[in-house]
């Protein structure tokens, strides 16, 4: 299952690819917007709410989340409520990057550089870092 949300339908990216996934039926896709315009055929609401409505089964599953930090925080909280472990949850921190080469130091958190050591990390790895991200 893929839960894909945006503020509005205009903010959705990869629209053609998402339409192909919706048609293909190989993967369940839940499209959601915070604010829907007239005629929006999919869900209206926030991604963390969708997580609790879809209730993905943590057995043989990983969760990958990206987006605004506040959304990630609540998605992770809901995944934990559903039984996902820290090793099954991954997120990205590219918002902290600037040069992308590890030279400017902007993305340094504890002893890692997000640009060089990530930008995708397990929740377990993030919990071992100072809460600077």
Could you describe each region identified by the protein language model?
Residues 1-98:
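FNR/FR-type flavoprotein reductase catalytic core
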Residues 12, 101, 125:
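Short acidic, gly/pro-rich beta-turn/loop elements at beta-sheet edges
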Residues 18, 80, 113-115, 131:
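Alpha-helix termini
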Residues 70, 94-119:
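Local cysteine-cluster metal-coordination motifs and their immediate loop/turn environment
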Residues 75, 107-108, 132:
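Short alpha-helix boundary/capping motifs
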Residues 120-133:
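Short microdomains enriched in Cys/His and/or Lys/Arg
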């Amino acid at each position: 299952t893929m839960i894909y949300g945006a503020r509005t339908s205009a903010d959705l990216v990869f629209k053609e690819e998402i339409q192909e996934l919706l048609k293909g039926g190989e993967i369940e896709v839940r499209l959601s917007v915070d604010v829907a315009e007239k005629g929006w055929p999919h869900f209206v609401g926030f991604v963390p709410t969708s997580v609790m409505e879809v209730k993905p089964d943590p057995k043989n599953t990983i969760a990958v989340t990206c987006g605004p930090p506040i959304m990630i925080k609540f998605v992770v909280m809901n995944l934990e409520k559903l039984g996902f472990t820290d090793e099954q949850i991954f997120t990205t921190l590219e918002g902290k990057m600037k040069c992308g080469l590890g030279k400017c130091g902007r993305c340094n958190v504890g002893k890692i550089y997000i640009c060089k050591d990530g930008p995708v990390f397990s929740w377990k790895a993030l919990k071992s870092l100072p809460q600077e991200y």
